[in-house]
Amino acid sequence: MSDSNPHVVGINVLKQNGLDVDELVKELIQNAAVEFTAYYYFTNLRAHCTGMEGEGLKGIIEDARLEDLSHFESCLERIYQLGGILPNDATEFIKISGCEFLQLPTNPTDHKAILEKCLKAEQGAIVNWNKICQMTFGKDPVT
């Protein structure tokens, strides 16, 4: 345990393994912001899926939405385990995500455009999580 904060678990072991814990917390906070923003965004997109085709898309978007919520909550747990905290200001938190692309399409009921937005969001998540995987590989079996 950390000498400076007895509530933080395993920090010294992670540092001994060569992990920059502060950088990891920073990346986890950014990923939490991305996942939270994506959850909000997918919730909004789902509401615009109307008609026969739209009803079919709702299930796909719901799966992505719930996955993003789960990832957000997982990030939170690990951030606090590592001694980090989230910003108190929700606007600041969302800005950290850098998710300007997460806007409704010009035509908010254009199902193809909605799917393209979903795909872009998921591609971004893969890049973000790969960065964390590379950072923690062989150093942090929990994250």
Task: Write out the residue ranges for each language-model feature.
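Mobile beta-alpha loop/short-helix "lid" or hinge segments that flank ligand
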Residues: 5-7, 90-97, 131
